From Swiss-Prot:
Transmembrane segments: none annotated. Keywords: GTP-binding, Nucleotide-binding, Repeat, Ribosome biogenesis. GO terms for biological process: ribosome biogenesis. PANTHER family: GTPASE DER. Residues 4-168, 177-352 form the EngA-type G domain. Associates with the 50S ribosomal subunit. Belongs to the TRAFAC class TrmE-Era-EngA-EngB-Septin-like GTPase superfamily. EngA (Der) GTPase family. The keyword Repeat applies. Residues 353-437 form the KH-like domain. This is GTPase Der. One of its GO terms (molecular function) is ribosome binding. InterPro entries: AAA+_ATPase, G_ENGA, GTP-bd, GTPase_Der, KH_dom-like, KH_dom-like_a/b, P-loop_NTPase, Small_GTP-bd.
């Protein structure tokens, strides 16, 4: 089911993220010289010889380290190995064989998964002799590459796809709905995703900011197939000191751009912040479907009016997106968690909704009869025809006598009429006006 999964594993700093980014063709994993900088799995789609597959970049495995983050990275890598169809075991040809390599090899042998041993950092022909000592790992013939110079990658990928050539290379997967979970650090994004997935998929610990990068997880449910993107929490600029944090802020915005639905998570005990408004404002500006989730609702003292009051306050602070859907949950206790993906799917359905042209024009004709367009200057707006030209978000073109005659208040009226007649809750809609000469 689905595309084959290829996991890139190995001890820290052997070049996994550099290789991953070369294969993905874009800078997906955070790459820095600090050991352990790729702290969680990151996914990307790849293709070679018409075979489509999913790659996983794992945090480096340090088998005997007691450091809390490293030990959690090791567990994450083990989960990636279990999920993978083929494993690329990356070692460092410059440093040579290390004890940690032997321990990783032992872990891979136990998995009984197909493994392609890849010796990285072989930048020159004369360095190829460095690969021989890795035969001692008992993993098979090594492939030599230089990920930084993109040398030998074709040979490596030939070996990888060899393992799933028997599988049918089907063309299209069912479309997955991309959902980005955004919000301040420690608002409960990773905890909610883990609850939805039913596995310890994301690093969750007491150390602030343990989701440094944006992480993808896949889940299939009765409501559809989803990609869940957990983003690093956005801090105020004064707190963003390390380079690593700057990368993560950029990645959060990039995650919003590739999402279909953005879920803003708010801490019920803290309420909405200026930072929350800023980040969801960006999602609104680039026309994403939006669901606002108030987490930690179990910690709030409440009566039967508390939720309505809280929602009313949120709507005031988020008045620029009156269409947003709201959900009050507790990721910790599981309260209403079952509704998260269902509600996100409703937002997505509205985000991709198409309205028949005949029905659309009937609604707009009725709206014009109820409220005639105002005169702007010396001309009155005439609407001849309207049609939907796209989705994500639903986009409508009105053919009119003069686009300059459209007053913002009348445009808002037309949008409200569309919303009243068709359910667009959870998504923005776009109205465009084009001139058409009257015949």
């Amino acid at each position: 089911m689905g595309k084959p999964i290829v996991a890139i594993v190995g001890r820290p700093n052997v070049g996994k993220s550099t290789l991953f980014n070369k294969l993905a063709g874009k800078r997906i994993a955070i790459v820095q010289d600090t050991p352990g900088v790729t702290r969680d799995r990151i996914y990307a789609e790849a293709e070679w010889l018409n075979y489509k597959f999913t790659m996983i970049d794992t945090g480096g495995i340090e088998p005997k380290s007691e450091d809390i983050i490293v030990s959690q990275m090791r567990r994450q890598a083990q989960i990636a190995i279990e999920m993978a169809n083929v494993i690329i075991f990356l070692v460092d040809g410059k440093e040579g064989l290390a004890p940690a390599d032997e321990e990783v090899a032992q872990m891979l042998r136990k998995s009984k998964k197909p493994v392609v041993l890849v010796v990285n950092k072989i930048d020159k022909l004369k360095d190829e002799n460095n690969a021989y000592e890795f035969y001692n790992l008992g993993i098979g013939d090594p492939v030599t590459i230089s990920s930084s110079q993109a040398l030998g990658l074709g040979d490596m990928l030939d070996r990888v796809v060899e393992y799933f050539k028997d599988d049918e290379s089907d063309g299209e997967d069912d479309e997955r709905i991309n959902i980005a979970f955004i919000g301040k650090p420690n608002v409960g994004k990773s905890s909610l995703i883990n609850k939805l997935l039913g596995e310890e998929r994301l690093i969750v610990s007491d150390i602030p900011g343990t989701t440094r990068d944006s992480i993808d997880s896949y889940v299939d449910t009765e409501f559809g197939e989803f990609t869940l993107i957990d983003t690093a929490g956005l801090r105020r600029k004064s707190k963003v000191k390390e380079e690593i944090e700057r990368y993560s802020v950029i990645r959060t915005y990039a995650s919003i751009e590739r999402a279909d639905v953005c879920i803003l998570m708010i801490d019920a005990t803290e309420g909405i912040s200026e930072q929350d408004q800023k980040i969801i404002g960006y999602a609104h500006d680039i026309n994403k479907a939006i669901l606002v989730i108030v987490n930690k609702w179990d910690l709030v003292e409440k009566d039967d009016k508390t939720m309505d009051k809280f929602k009313k306050e949120l709507k005031v602070n988020l008045s620029f997106m009156p269409y947003a859907k709201y959900l009050f949950i507790s990721a910790k206790t599981g309260q209403r968690v079952v509704k998260v993906l269902q509600t996100a799917k409703e937002c997505y359905d509205n985000y991709t909704k198409r309205v028949k042209t005949g029905v659309l024009n009937d609604v707009i004709s009725q709206a014009i009869m109820m409220k005639e367009p105002p005169i702007v200057g010396t001309k009155r707006l005439k609407i001849y025809y309207v049609t939907q030209i796209g989705t994500k978000p639903p986009t409508f073109i009105f053919f009119v006598n003069d686009p300059a005659c459209i007053h913002f208040s009348y445009q808002r009226y037309l949008e409200n009429q569309l919303r009243e007649n068709f359910d667009f809750q959870g998504t923005g809609i776009k109205l465009e006006f084009r001139e058409r000469k009257e015949k």
